[in-house]
Regions:
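Amphipathic alpha-helical polymerization modules
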Residues: 1-137
Length: 137
């Protein structure tokens, strides 16, 4: 029986490769979002009263891949945690009291998340490599 999406036969090997390929794409999206967070970790508003960059977080959703459960990036949501506040009355975005809102990005957390995403990506690459090396039935 062929897969309705790609036309290949539905086999455990192809299913494993499909699940892992979807996970690779999801982790790639996750790493892109983390990189954007790190790149904007110091991006403040340019005018008083404006908001700085708000950390983005990926939301994943389960999906069916030939009877197995895979994953897909469902959406990217802004992190609603509060902004950091710093006293800097000379900054163009400082409020009347001299405080500037800073992004709610913690670069240490982002670095840990990046490493976790890299390891998940590598694990899924290994699944694909192992599935490719399996003998077809």
């Amino acid at each position: 029986m062929p897969d309705p999406v790609n036309g290949r036969p539905v086999t455990p090997r192809n299913t494993a490769m499909g699940v892992a390929a979807g996970a690779l794409k999801a982790q790639q999206s996750r790493m892109r979002i983390i990189a954007e967070n790190i790149a904007n970790a110091q991006s403040t508003a340019t005018v008083a009263g404006g908001e700085p960059y708000r950390r983005q977080t990926p939301v994943f959703q389960a999906r069916n891949v030939n009877g197995a459960t895979g994953v897909v990036l469902a959406e990217v949501r802004p992190d609603q945690s509060p902004f950091r506040v710093e006293y800097d009355p000379s900054h163009p975005a400082a409020n009347a009291e001299g405080y500037v809102q800073r992004p709610n990005v913690d670069t240490l957390v982002e670095a840990m998340d990046m490493r976790e995403a890299q390891r998940a990506y590598e694990a899924n690459l290994n699944v694909i490599e192992t599935a490719r090396n399996m003998e077809s039935p």
